[in-house]
């Protein structure tokens, strides 16, 4: 039977429990039509690149499906009807990826980075305080002191 990867996005105001119920419902439809769900991953509530149906965030869920195309057609029909599902995408693949998907590996890597601790001084790279001996920033090097500034009246008189 053909293999598919199916991802759907649920509304941001749906609870995690509601998203799990949606996943169970979709899995039931797949298994009822002779398909099989080999892997389910909930990627959690993530920010969207742009607003979709007034949502700035969505719950992402991925399913690996092993079943005929009629299963995918019915799942997509059910998702079109359901108001909690914003978007969905089904892609046919040659084989399912073993282990966690790229999104789950990225989430694990991000968690590891957070565990490393903060920077010394407690700030992020954007804080530029305490740089050099001058107030507000940078090292002046071998530049001498500034020349006195000409007044606007003096500059206008020298041009004439």
Curated annotation (Swiss-Prot):
InterPro entries attached to this UniProt entry: Ribosomal_bS6 (IPR000529), Ribosomal_bS6_sf (IPR035980), Ribosomal_S6_plastid/chlpt (IPR020814), Transl_elong_EF1B/ribsomal_bS6 (IPR014717)
Gene3D superfamilies noted in UniProt: 3.30.70.60
Annotated keywords: Ribonucleoprotein, Ribosomal protein, RNA-binding, rRNA-binding
GO MF annotation, one: small ribosomal subunit rRNA binding
Gene Ontology BP annotations: translation
GO cellular component, one term: cytosolic small ribosomal subunit
Stretches with biased composition (Basic and acidic residues): 94-119, 125-152
Span list, region Disordered: 94-160
UniProt xrefs under SUPFAM superfamilies: Ribosomal protein S6 (SSF54995)
Annotated Pfam families: Ribosomal_S6
HAMAP family: Ribosomal_bS6
Family affiliation: Belongs to the bacterial ribosomal protein bS6 family.
Function field: Binds together with bS18 to 16S ribosomal RNA.
Protein name as annotated: Small ribosomal subunit protein bS6
Encoding gene per record: rpsF
């Amino acid at each position: 039977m053909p293999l598919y990867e199916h991802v759907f996005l649920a509304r941001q105001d749906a609870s995690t429990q509601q998203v799990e119920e949606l996943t169970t419902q979709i899995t039931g439809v797949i298994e009822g039509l002779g398909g099989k769900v080999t892997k389910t991953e909930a990627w959690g509530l993530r920010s969207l690149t742009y607003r979709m149906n007034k949502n700035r965030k969505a719950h992402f869920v991925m399913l690996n499906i092993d079943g005929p195309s009629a299963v995918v057609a019915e799942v997509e029909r059910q998702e079109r009807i359901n108001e909690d599902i914003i978007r969905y995408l089904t892609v046919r693949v040659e084989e399912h990826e073993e282990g966690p998907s790229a999104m789950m590996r990225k989430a694990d890597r991000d968690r590891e980075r957070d565990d490393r601790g903060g920077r010394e001084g407690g700030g992020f790279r954007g804080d530029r305080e305490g740089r050099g001996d001058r107030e507000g920033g940078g090292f002046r090097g071998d530049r001498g002191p500034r020349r006195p500034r000409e007044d606007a009246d003096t500059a206008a008189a020298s041009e004439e």
